[in-house]
Amino acid sequence: MQYPKNYDVVVIGGGHAGTEAALAAARMGAQTLLLTHNIETLGQMSCNPAIGGIGKSHLVREIDALGGAMALATDKSGIQFRVLNSRKGAAVRATRAQADRILYKAAIRHTLENQPNLDIFQQAADDILVENGRATAVVTATGIIFNTQTVVLTSGTFLGGVIHIGLESSKGGRAGDQPSIKLADRLRELKLPVGRLKTGTPARIDARSVDFSVMAVQPGDTPLPVMSYMGDVSMHPEQVNCYITHTNARTHDIIRENLDRSPMFSGKIEGVGPRYCPSIEDKIHRFADKDSHQIFIEPEGLTTHELYPNGISTSLPFDVQLEFIHSMKGLENAHITRPGYAIEYDYFDPQNLKPTLETKSIDRLYFAGQINGTTGYEEAGVQGLLAGTNAALVTCENSEFDVWTPRRDEAYLGVLVDDLITHGTTEPYRMFTSRAEYRLLLREDNADQRLTETGRKLGLVDDVRWQAYEEKMEAIASETSRLKDIWATPINALGAQVTAQTGEVLSKESTAYDLLKRPQIHFNDIAAITGSEVDSQVGEQIEISVKYAGYIDRQQEDIDQMKRLENTALPMDFDYSVVSGLSNEIVQKLAQVRPSTLAQAGRISGVTPAAIQLLAMTVKKQKKVQAALNAS
């Protein structure tokens, strides 16, 4: 049957990509439907119960700066918060939160159910209707047809999903959930470039069977950090400890002796697994010289005894899992509540995507999350937000944007998308700060300053968040001005206080603002002396902007040069074979990737600076010819 209501955007999948996609589209005013196989699993954390980490928290903050749900849901569910790399530079500092699975899922569902313009419907999607090269409707398992202007597909690990435990395998999207077989077959019919990837999860353990007394305690940070710019410590539930144990020689022997029973090593699994989150059997094989690996014992929530042993993801048979877990200190009597497993699933070459995450071959069909070859909640969430935003823009008549994708110098989201569509991936892609060439400008602390104004123009940022952002920016400007008006000299009282509190002896007069350039002097020192009571986020921004000013200016110069290439568009139907001087190899690579700008073309492996110059001259010449034709 035809559903009586027509939608602007239909989002398939209620995971981290799907929820952010649906929320973004609805916030922008698009009539949106979130289609999920099970309403009870909306926002479910399928693997580790944690949000954030190196590179990942930067993505979470970007989602938050654009009005998304992930960061606030984390503040409402986080049972341990830590700042990683806290002693390193501002660019690589990262917040990580251990989350209560039940509370996180509840926070996401509450946000979804209270979002205007958003409907939720429980049913698996079996088909996407395509007419004249454009997605027009979604068909459910029972034949309900939802007509729509755009479709966002966020299928996670469900497309053709196969679960492996030892040499036994079964069809599944994750443990306890059916896979999407018909939809996977339909996408293959559409001749989209498909591959197989693999991920996995460890066994879960009953905390009552664990001896924590022999493990190292890993407490959270004090004072507690928050994940969202709108978050507050008062939102946090009860805080708990995590624990650390280790594998040992006996653990490794057990695993090595049973590698022939591993689907990964027997050849049963064809999909490539995540390089930066390998299974324990892969670790033992790849790092044979190591006699021990850290294992983090993480609570799954406040109302459950289940623990997540981070670091022992596995697809080995259950009897082997039991044996190697019992070989570790503190886990000798551990009761396993759920076995670990690997899951193999379809993904589609992201080089077939536009920067908006719309497929090149089918108009108005967008992909986000693991279907694009990424791994991680955060990577999925930020893609969902981008896909949902661009899907909604198709239906918006009054927006100043036709499409929107941030550049590499604007957001880690820009880095992620550019990496995917330019280089593709043959293994699950994970974000790291090292992937960003402008990471000093792309810190987790300034995501709001980079993106919230754009989010407001797009319609993603509501009045409450916008007011908070404006107040923060006014506070930064006001406090900066105040500090520039306060002078410390070697002989005045302020200078003496600075020396007494920090040990820094002044040799000449200096403003309180300029004092922050000194490595040993921090904003909190100056605030204590001068009586400032501004928010800690404001102080942090001022201190970073002062201490890193020289480096930031140099990166900005590099960005200004790159922008000239970013602003030179390459048409999707550009004929590279007519560019005199390009080698056949470069022509083939450019024709395959179809870069949208000269800058993206320059990031394709094998495309030389000389080739970019030839392209630039050809584009310039074509523009002149076109301008002359238009004038005649």
From Swiss-Prot:
GO biological process, one term: tRNA wobble uridine modification
Positions bound to FAD: G13, G14, G15, H16, A17, G18
Principal place of residence: cytoplasm
Keywords for the protein's UniProt record, in alphabetical order: Cytoplasm, FAD, Flavoprotein, NAD, tRNA processing
Protein location: Cytoplasm
Superkingdom per UniProt: Bacteria
Molecular function terms from GO: flavin adenine dinucleotide binding
Positions with a binding annotation for NAD(+): 273-287
Cofactor needs: FAD
InterPro entries documented for this protein: FAD/NAD-bd_sf (IPR036188), GIDA_C_N (IPR049312), MnmG (IPR004416), MnmG-rel (IPR002218), MnmG-rel_CS (IPR020595), MnmG_C (IPR026904), MnmG_C_subdom (IPR047001), MnmG_C_subdom_sf (IPR044920)
GO cellular component, one term: cytosol
Role noted for this protein: NAD-binding protein involved in the addition of a carboxymethylaminomethyl (cmnm) group at the wobble position (U34) of certain tRNAs, forming tRNA-cmnm(5)s(2)U34.
Family: Belongs to the MnmG family.
Quaternary state and interactors: Homodimer. Heterotetramer of two MnmE and two MnmG subunits.
PANTHER family according to UniProt: GLUCOSE INHIBITED DIVISION PROTEIN A, PROTEIN MTO1 HOMOLOG, MITOCHONDRIAL
Protein name: tRNA uridine 5-carboxymethylaminomethyl modification enzyme MnmG
Organism: Psychrobacter arcticus (strain DSM 17307 / VKM B-2377 / 273-4)
Gene designation per UniProt: mnmG
